């Protein structure tokens, strides 16, 4: 059976950390916690529950903190979790079964991640994340914000579901501040960084700046063919909203149509196009695009 080090970065998570660690005790062979400056009881709770806790001075870099935690791991595989992640009993059982079948031939395991839930508690947003990496393969996180590991080697999909159950709101300006600091320092922006930087500007209704960043992201894709296609489609859609906010209606329409370069038309984009023509009294064109969404 494969051995797994569960690796986490935490700060002031006393309200949720015990819930998370109670889940992972079922399958973790080692728990590594990188604490970035907790002032509550997080560290003592982690230690009481058998985790190895290491101090990591925070420097606005999530990838660096994740990599620090991975560097402390001693088992065959490293698995990352957030403090407000949980697993159901069924998910834990599926994970145990996966451990029995996991061999050294697998470099990376993708697991489903539920990050949004409807009013009935049912998952409304689910996608796969790179969750488990072979320790000796030297995988590294990239990105000061929205850190991720590039897929490589032998990649397999598992079925054990991780649920992200956030209980408190974080600092809504934190990510934006980090990206702006990267700009001031002239740090390199990877395509993924540009996408999420544009989103942060968009969410804060800084449309003119967001438009420029989304354009940089989409131009980088056309030049280098890098980036996840769903991010490109979403960037084109949010670019359109920025253009509307700036009174650039034709540019907004072109942004929506640009999404078709990346993949088959998405229903959401077709609805956006329908709304564009409906708002301008061009009903036949609106009907056409709404029908495409069906």
Locations of regions flagged by a protein language model:
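N-proximal low-complexity "stem/linker" segments adjacent to membrane-targeting elements
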Residues: 1-23
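A conserved acidic beta->alpha catalytic loop
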Residues: 23, 35-47, 58, 82
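Tetratricopeptide repeat
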Residues: 25, 173-176, 180, 211, ...
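Conserved donor nucleotide-binding strand/loop of the catalytic core
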Residues: 43-68, 72
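Catalytic-site signature of metal-activated, phosphate-bearing donor transferases
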Residues: 64-70, 76, 87-212, 216, ...
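Start-of-helix register in tetratricopeptide repeats
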Residues: 192, 227-234, 268
């Amino acid at each position: 059976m494969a051995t797994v080090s569960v690796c986490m970065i935490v700060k002031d998570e006393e309200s949720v950390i015990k819930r998370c660690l109670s889940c992972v005790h079922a399958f973790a062979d080692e728990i590594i916690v990188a604490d970035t400056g907790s002032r509550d009881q997080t560290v003592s709770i982690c230690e009481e529950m058998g985790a190895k806790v290491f101090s990591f001075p925070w420097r606005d870099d999530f990838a660096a903190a994740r990599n620090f935690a991975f560097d402390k791991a001693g088992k065959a595989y490293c698995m990352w979790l957030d403090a407000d992640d949980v697993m159901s009993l069924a998910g834990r059982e599926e994970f145990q079964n996966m451990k029995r079948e996991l061999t050294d031939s697998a470099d990376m395991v993708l697991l489903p991640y539920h990050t949004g839930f409807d009013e009935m508690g049912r998952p409304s947003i689910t996608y796969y994340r790179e969750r488990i990496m072979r320790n000796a393969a030297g995988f590294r996180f990239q990105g000061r914000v929205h850190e991720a590991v590039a897929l490589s080697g032998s990649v397999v999909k598992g079925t054990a579901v991780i649920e992200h159950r956030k209980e408190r709101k974080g600092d809504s300006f934190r990510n934006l501040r980090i990206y702006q600091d990267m700009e001031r320092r002239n740090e390199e922006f990877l395509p993924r960084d540009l996408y999420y930087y544009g989103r942060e500007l968009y969410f804060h209704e800084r449309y003119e700046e967001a438009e420029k960043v989304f354009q940089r992201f989409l131009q980088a894709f056309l030049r280098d063919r890098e980036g996840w296609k769903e991010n490109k489609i979403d960037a084109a859609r949010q670019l359109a909203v920025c253009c509307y906010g700036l009174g650039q209606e034709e540019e907004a329409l072109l942004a929506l149509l640009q999404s078709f370069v990346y993949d088959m038309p998405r229903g959401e984009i077709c609805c956006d196009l329908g709304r564009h023509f409906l708002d301008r009294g061009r009903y036949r064109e609106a009907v056409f695009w709404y029908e495409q969404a069906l």
